[in-house]
Amino acid sequence: MTDHALLLVNLGSPASTSVADVRRYLNQFLMDPYVVDLPWPVRRLLVSLILIKRPEQSAHAYASIWWDEGSPLVVLTRRLQAAMVEHWPHGPVEIAMRYGEPALPQVLERLAAQGVRKVTLAPLYPQFADSTVTTVVALANQTVAERALPLQLRVLQPFYDHPEYIDALVASARPYLEQDYDHLLLSFHGLPERHLKKLMPGSKHDLRAADCCKDASAEVRAVCYRGQCLASAKAFATRMGIPDGKWSVSFQSRLGRDKWIEPYTETRLDELAKAGAKKLLVMCPAFVADCIETLEEIGDRGKEQFIEAGGEELVLVPCLNDHPEWVRVLARMCEKA
């Protein structure tokens, strides 16, 4: 075994569906300044208020989608890890979570102790955001520096418009899209508008435009999460040959009262049902592995909302997970990182 490891990093999950474990996980997640970007005292107060009721609510949601093997996100990321071993001859393939276990700092320490000297760090997020990519890279660099680990890090960059990533989406989703359906909704995880605006100070970038990055500079496109989501969706629809009007984009998982990027998924579900859509397909391309946001928020609550609004069937298209084409594509992208 050589000294070059591949480290696949995903968001994370509570250790169990107990309220205590969910509270611990939510506290770690929400206290990350890249997630809740407020001054520490304000962030601590806000998170403390959220943790009064949210852990019990979230524990119920996790319990509704929990597998016998554990958290779907962790289980699916481990399956991806197992498949990637055959495609990475340079050293060990490991996984880490930004929040929860296996914790990123401990995994880096273990790799260094095993004699690894190079690590290709693969944040499993197609689109760029501070709350996903930046926080992973920052924690990895901080860990290496503070613990004096003899590790050289390389980072897989966001791949939202990489042709092979789009091909993997097509290969994974094609069996569902070859069936009859009325509309395809591509639902991405949402972000507060301020997360994007602070990355483009002085820019007149319109985050509510139908194509917000149409005339944007390369610097703005590199940090505009919304524009990258729209680009992923457009590339996928074009590659699949889905006509305009039969697909649309929305953003889910809004938390709090701040303005988030639009349109909101819950709004689109009602609009599509009332417009006459009976069978709705929903894809969530911001996630490469199914998780609470896909299985519970869309697959359960979203389906219930759509049917109550007049629709008849909502089909959740699985994420890439450990699809063979995705495994091959990810391996090639990591080789070139």
From Swiss-Prot:
Record-linked InterPro entries: Ferrochelatase, Ferrochelatase_C, Ferrochelatase_N
A Pfam family hit: Ferrochelatase
Compartment list: Cytoplasm
Ranges annotated as spanning the membrane: none
Any GO BP: heme biosynthetic process
Major place of residence: cytoplasm
Known pathway: Porphyrin-containing compound metabolism; protoheme biosynthesis; protoheme from protoporphyrin-IX: step 1/1
Keywords (A to Z) from UniProt: Cytoplasm, Heme biosynthesis, Iron, Lyase, Metal-binding, Porphyrin biosynthesis
Catalytic activity line of the entry: heme b + 2 H(+) = protoporphyrin IX + Fe(2+)
CDD domains: Ferrochelatase_C (cd00419), Ferrochelatase_N (cd03411)
UniProt GO cellular component terms: cytoplasm
EC number: 4.98.1.1
Gene Ontology molecular function, alphabetical: ferrochelatase activity; metal ion binding
Superkingdom in the source lineage: Bacteria
Role noted for this protein: Catalyzes the ferrous insertion into protoporphyrin IX.
PANTHER family: FERROCHELATASE, FERROCHELATASE, MITOCHONDRIAL
Family: Belongs to the ferrochelatase family.
Protein name: Ferrochelatase
Gene from which this protein is expressed: hemH
